[in-house]
């Protein structure tokens, strides 16, 4: 059963009288339906009295074997309410039919076999018979004859019955009624009880309390089963198991979970189950890295052709450690001035503090005469925005929740370690793989250590994602990163950049004035919770913005399993984000070409001083 929150609750399933299928033979009403029995009382638990029970046969004419009496001392406990009822002897005989001679059912007696494996999903209960007890009344010479017949049948049962029929039961099994079994002929009774309890046997388990039943109700179901056991020989154990058969082939726990997930997937066929688990850690343990000199080519095989990115600092490509074969990402930083090395040392110091699976991990740092190379965890999924604009990807609001929650987890850890990223943007959020929803934050080149008691100001970043305090060159705090998170969330939901202008000046003016709004068309399918989440981040006043911890407690980022069932509408942001990425690429190419042309003109005129060269 799937709860409201989507969990599969597994539990022992009671087999009530109303839920049990009818007998296979004739599909007619069962014997228990034809002859309803009165509710059992405390008197039913005492040995029967021929005078009090007019329906009991005369012991002199139809004596019961003493072996049919159950030893109360060996009984594990009263019957659980709703447990399956005992099977008839006719369904378990060596040839598939009951013994007409009145012997007990096949496998109904004998020493118990080895305990079944813990993974067994059905358990057999062998109800021990005490040969010292006998029914009331004078048995005479018939007692010895019946006892011999019972012994022969028990021996036949041990030879021909399956192994699991002899396995001992857990204490939660059905206990036999103390009432005499002379209501039906001996050939139609059995002492085997199978239960569908899929738990490991525990001798300390009392059993009946868990089922919530009473001894009286349990005895009533036993009495009804004994009356109907004569028709059980034609029943099938699997599929249409009738109520006379006390064996239920309960599937294993893993199968039940799989079936529940399949059912959920069928009910919500338009929703794909999200892998909202935390991403796996780096393929190497967290380490404290120190910048050292060395020969890069002797330790690593650089693959400069497989470029992963680049910028003002240099380029990023893949590489392989020769000693271990570990694939890594190599960030090659040009060392032109002493400040360049100082910035790299600060980046190494920051990354040494960040041991979190939503944050990229540093492996090694090597300095050469002209470069500093940082070897980091390789993340193969690519940029988040590149991933979600794929035509085969179905972006929903729930996907956005999963992405944003992981980003918040990484930011929260950074802030607890007194680190500010200060350059959160879509390019710095990578997917772990090309198919899942797991992301990691990268690029700590602009990150700073943060002390709330000290004033910290910065004047760098990407204009679209800068906060008002950075543009104004005011004191920053951990809330500065939260503004950038609000911009990223806005873009994931709508595909639009809230402050993007025709140029950087217009963009910065929009940021300073906090001039933004929810576009009616693009936010048509977005929930009010998502809008409230963004509104509490894109606030000019730092103190009014949510922290990372408050974001994780926001209603929008919680109860994802429940929201996934009803929030399956595809967002329009996919199409708009694709246009945004195309425009971003065009802008980068335009700037690069313009800079190259300008440099060519200036160099030809000999006025390099205009560029500060």
UniProtKB/Swiss-Prot annotation:
Biased segments, Gly residues type: 95-105
Localization: Cytoplasm
Coiled coil: none
Residues recorded with modification Phosphothreonine: 462
Active site: 423
Region spans: Calmodulin-binding: 591-603
Annotated Pfam families: Pkinase (PF00069)
Protein kinase domain location: 302-557
GO cellular component term of the entry, any: nucleus
Protein name listed in UniProt: Myosin light chain kinase 2, skeletal/cardiac muscle
Natural source organism: Mus musculus (Mouse)
């Amino acid at each position: 059963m799937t709860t409201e929150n989507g969990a599969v609750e597994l539990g022992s399933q009671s087999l009530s009288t109303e839920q049990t299928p009818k007998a296979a033979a004739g599909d007619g009403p069962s014997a228990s339906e034809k002859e309803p029995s009165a509710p059992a009382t405390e008197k039913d638990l005492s040995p029967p009295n021929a005078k009090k029970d007019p329906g009991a046969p005369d012991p002199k004419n139809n004596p019961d074997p003493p072996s049919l009496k159950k030893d109360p001392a060996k009984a594990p406990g009263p019957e659980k309410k709703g447990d399956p009822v005992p099977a008839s002897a006719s369904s378990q005989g060596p040839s598939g039919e009951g013994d007409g001679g009145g012997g007990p059912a096949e496998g109904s007696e004998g020493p118990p076999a080895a305990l079944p494996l813990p993974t067994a999903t059905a358990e057999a209960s062998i109800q021990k018979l005490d040969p010292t007890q006998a029914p009331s009344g004078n048995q005479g010479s018939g007692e010895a004859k019946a006892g011999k017949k019972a012994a022969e049948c028990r021996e036949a049962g041990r030879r021909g019955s399956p192994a699991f029929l002899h396995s001992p039961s857990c204490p939660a099994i059905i206990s036999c009624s103390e009432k005499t079994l002379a209501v039906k002929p001996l050939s139609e009774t059995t002492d085997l009880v199978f239960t569908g309890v899929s738990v490991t046997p525990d001798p300390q388990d009392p059993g009946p309390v868990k089922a919530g039943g009473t001894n009286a109700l349990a005895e009533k179901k036993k009495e009804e089963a004994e009356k109907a056991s004569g028709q059980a020989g034609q029943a099938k154990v699997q599929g249409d198991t009738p109520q006379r058969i006390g064996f239920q082939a309960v599937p294993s726990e893993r199968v039940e979970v799989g079936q529940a997930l399949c059912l959920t997937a069928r009910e919500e066929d338009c929703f794909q189950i999200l892998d909202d688990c935390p991403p796996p850690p780096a393929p190497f343990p967290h380490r404290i890295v120190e910048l050292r000199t060395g020969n890069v080519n002797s330790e690593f095989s650089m693959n400069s052709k497989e470029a992963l990115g680049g910028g003002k600092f240099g380029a990023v490509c893949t590489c392989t450690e020769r000693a271990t074969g570990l694939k890594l990402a190599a960030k090659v930083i040009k060392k032109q001035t002493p400040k360049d090395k100082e910035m790299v040392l600060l980046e190494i110091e920051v990354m040494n503090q960040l041991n979190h699976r939503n944050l990229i991990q540093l492996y090694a740092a090597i300095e050469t005469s002209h470069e500093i190379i940082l070897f980091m965890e390789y993340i193969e999924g690519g940029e988040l925005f590149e991933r979600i604009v794929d035509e085969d990807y179905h972006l929903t609001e729930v996907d956005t929740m999963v992405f944003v929650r992981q980003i918040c987890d990484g930011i929260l850890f950074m802030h607890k370690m007194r680190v500010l990223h200060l350059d959160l943007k879509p390019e710095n959020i990578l997917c772990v793989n090309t198919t899942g929803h797991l992301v990691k934050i990268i690029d700590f080149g602009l990150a700073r250590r943060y002390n709330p008691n000290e004033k910290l100001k910065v004047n760098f970043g990407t204009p679209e994602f800068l906060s008002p305090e950075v543009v104004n060159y005011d004191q920053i705090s951990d809330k500065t990163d939260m503004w950038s998170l609000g911009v990223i969330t806005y873009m994931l939901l709508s595909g639009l950049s809230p402050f993007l202008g025709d140029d950087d000046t217009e963009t910065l003016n929009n940021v300073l004035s906090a001039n933004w709004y929810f576009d009616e068309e693009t936010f048509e399918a977005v929930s009010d919770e998502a809008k409230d989440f963004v509104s509490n981040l894109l606030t000019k006043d730092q103190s009014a913005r949510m922290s990372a911890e408050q974001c994780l407690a926001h209603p929008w980022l919680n109860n994802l399993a429940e929201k996934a069932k009803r929030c399956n509408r595809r967002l329009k942001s996919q199409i708009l984000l694709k246009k945004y990425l195309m425009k971003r690429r065009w802008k980068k190419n335009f700037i690069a070409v313009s800079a190259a042309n300008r440099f060519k003109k200036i160099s030809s005129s000999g006025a390099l001083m205009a560029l500060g060269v």
